[in-house]
């Protein structure tokens, strides 16, 4: 059944009637709901059900299994908290995972004092991994379950944001500075740390987000939103082709997230 318009369940639970009686469901039933972004979740029963005309059965509540954890970072720490457990008195009792960047000093080849100034921490690979960037010129990909550093580069000056791209490649937004690699969006391959495969100019680059539906990379910096498509992506020399630049009403763009396949949130 497809309703004539999407049903808004963000504020409260909603009852969705489905008319199928009379019917015998000898093996029970499964009800699957799909949201406007294509995420599906189900509720059901294995008990047999017989409905005569006019009868009804109410299923259990169907709840999305989308992650309700909040990830935030600053200084040398990354924290993951259960948003359902946190309250106005604090978050510490709700911490489910944390990472201290100084523990990766040897892997990064940096002094512990440079494993600091974290700017971005972004869950990727269905929440199994985490991309972390630092203004001290590095980016790392972590396995959340083990804390292992799966990829790192220290060639990303003033790295402010990163994003996973298809075929195990990573985009990094490198913000302002005097280095020739500042004010760029860089592309790396996970298997080849510290090797910049491609970079594109973007003044004060601060955010990168991949949209799987549109197959486009969105990047922000200064007063610009730049939209890239992938070019020669499976070759040894991939690149980002600038497709469009959108000037935003105000400058100083600092952060961006993908709300859904049709909506970006930019701050």
What are these regions (language model features)?
Residues 82-89, 229-237:
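Short loop/turn segments immediately following beta-strands, especially the blade-tip
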